[in-house]
Amino acid sequence: MEDEERLQLGGNPDWMSLLPAELLDVPLWNLAIPGSHDSMSFCLDVSSPVLKSEPRLLRVIDMLFPCWTRPCIYRWATTQQSVLSDQCDLGIRFFDLRIARKPAGGRKLFFAHGIYTLITVKEALGELATWLDTHPKEIIIIACSHFESLTDEDHCQLADYIISLFGKKLCSSEDIPTLRSCWCRGQQVVVSYDDQQMVLQHPELWTGIPYWYADSSDPKKVIAYLEEQKHRGRPDGFYVSGLNLTEDAAYILLHPLQDMRTLTLRALSLLLRWASEQQPGGGAGGLNVLCCDFVDVSHFCSLVIRLNYKKVLAAPRAVCTVPRATAESIGCCHSNQAGHPT
């Protein structure tokens, strides 16, 4: 298949626009979508303090020996090495954004993973908005979470900024987004916001997206955990399966010269082999978003995108249930009001 061969070339900047017609009316949460875990960790500030939410032992050691703890945390907390626009070009469409207020950062908001980032929230979201302008048929999911030290005022200002920045590109949480419906409406952005009060105030924001992760450094345990979750049944709507490995503070302090990249690369072949055996869809074991660390060092994105072609081969020829005449008469836009996800 020509489109599949194109995916082998490395970059996937417009992969959604190339998907077969059979997938255009499938809810986005039934497609396989590549995502990056801790998407902003490529720009951690090694001079910033450890987060207040980190274990007390780590914070105490950081106060006493910052020149030792911070480089150590930097090596273990860095899980990506590409800027957001490059991640988009690779094919990433889900962004795990962990937002925080830096102690000495004034009113600006940053991101955090162990320590804080150099790039602000406004700078990062602006980069995504610029990229979307040149890729009008690509749809991204921005998952905002954690909100370390944010005040109510911070939340209000952040939500207002997101809505003003993306405007009509935002998919309403009251809809069931598909590629076709988003294209017809000019929508390109799903924003989940892990604060229920803000979600209730803004229909443009979606509730927090479930993220399955094993909290283990052993890839076999990660796979076993994800398999167990699959057997329990997938959530309705969007959800994430995390291939990311996790180390605790004690291990990090005892291995200051190692890093997450080495650990990830060692496990990647096993994790990607499991990923290649999955299939997207609304069934009990159906995959949706799959997140990984260091998304630029393997064929991760292309592998996940190809799972959608597996879905086409497994499905009946006719996917769209809307009569042809009806679809044409309304200019290809169906009613996708939320009801019973498929």
Regions found by a protein language model. Give the residues of each.
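Long, acidic (Asp/Glu-rich), low-complexity accessory segments flanking structured domains
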Residues: 1-90, 103-135, 139, 157, ...
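Conserved, mostly hydrophobic/aromatic
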Residues: 87, 98, 142, 191, ...
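Active-site groove signature of glycoside hydrolases
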Residues: 101, 136-150
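Active-site cleft segment of glycoside hydrolase catalytic domains centered on the general acid/base Glu
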Residues: 148, 153-158
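Active-site-adjacent pocket scaffolds in enzyme catalytic domains
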Residues: 156-248
